[in-house]
Amino acid sequence: MTGLLNGKVVAITGGVTGIGRAIAIEMARNGAKVVVNHLPSEEQAQLAKELKEEISDGENNVLTIPGDISLPETGRRIVELAVEKFGEINVFVSNAGVCGFREFLEITPETLFQTVNINLNGAFFAIQAAAQQMVKQGKGGSIIGISSISALVGGAHQTHYTPTKAGILSLMQSTACALGKYGIRCNAILPGTISTALNEEDLKDPEKRKYMEGRIPLGRVGDPKDIAGPAIFLASDMSNYVNGAQLLVDGGLFVNLQ
């Protein structure tokens, strides 16, 4: 198979559901060898098996790795196993994240710490591990952080979540400065309202869905596949001079003030 990512090895955290899954599928279709991290559970293992069956090209182009991304050692393990399997890593997509809607006055320390550890701390250590390997290889690379429109605006029921996504955006900007001298590009994608498990309950409510769609100039909520295209662009050589950028993928939601 040939494509925009032919010959590249890509690792994705949180890659068996939602946005991560869509990115994994489309990157494989564009010729990449794909390493997919997922939570160590029976359900996620089954999803990983199904994903592998869907995108495998018969040439052993997919590796799935269970692991809790909130643990610093998980990022290192993903990179180590990716290199052991495919010899190198060229693209790293930090996607794993959680978002349970909560009233600010009722958020417990446990909920906050879990959200920060998964969404931000885990991303930091995984990105660091990927960058260390890319520097060792001496061939540059591309690191993509999946942030959110929530990095730019507030959310009454997301006070534990929005700071982590703002943190991802800031992390990608700072790593762009820190790693540019090694030829490693770091960029953020900021999805708007995307139909995933994170907002499944909200989108089941006809009134809430109508309200959400009414605020989006394109008139629909996004599909996970809508994020895959921008991710492929940032992973590919077409974006060789794109570094420290934030790519808002929201159907026009952010700019619609009326």
Swiss-Prot record:
GO terms for biological process: fatty acid biosynthetic process; rhamnose catabolic process. Induction: Up-regulated by growth on rhamnose. Optimum pH is 9.5. It catalyses: L-rhamnofuranose + NAD(+) = L-rhamnono-1,4-lactone + NADH + H(+). NADP(+) binds at residues 19, 68, 95, 161, 165, 194, 196. It is an enzyme of class 1 (oxidoreductase). InterPro entries: NAD(P)-bd_dom_sf (IPR036291), SDR_fam (IPR002347). The keyword Oxidoreductase applies. Gene3D superfamilies: NAD(P)-binding Rossmann-like Domain (3.40.50.720). It holds the Pfam family adh_short_C2. GO terms for molecular function: L-rhamnose 1-dehydrogenase activity; NADH dehydrogenase activity; quinone binding. The active site is at residues 147, 161, 165. NAD-dependent dehydrogenase that has high activity with L-rhamnose and L-lyxose, and shows only low activity with L-mannose. Has no activity with NADP. Catalyzes the first step in an alternative pathway for rhamnose utilization that does not involve phosphorylated intermediates. This is L-rhamnose-1-dehydrogenase. The lineage of its organism: Eukaryota, Fungi, Dikarya, Ascomycota, Saccharomycotina.
